[in-house]
Amino acid sequence: MLGILLAFICLWLTLIPPAFAADLANGAAVFEARCVGCHVNGGNIVRRNKTLKQKALQKFGMDSIEAVEAIVTNGKNNMSAYKDKLTEEQIHDVAAYVLDRAAADWRS
């Protein structure tokens, strides 16, 4: 019985979506170091309608881990590219953090 339980747990762990496998604490640290200057509390001081709030992310098709990772990696318009400044893991973590905070409306 214990073997079946362990097998089930191992299988379940392999099925965890990448956003949940991210290190949100690391994502928060990256966000504080690199993003908060323009995106304090999920806002946007450069383009006020393109915030990191859930509604705006959905409106602009940025509400998936892949979309946020792509814009962090490659940048777009006034958004700087971070592919040469952050590791893939940091990009994944900060993208997951952004989506997590957006889902919580940037409240603690």
Language-model features and meaning:
Residues P18, L24-A25, V72, H92:
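Hydrophobic alpha-helical segments
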Residues L15, A29-E32:
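Processing junctions and N-termini across compartments
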Residues W12, P18, Q58-K59, Y82-K85:
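Short N-terminal micro-motifs specific to bacterial/archaeal maturation
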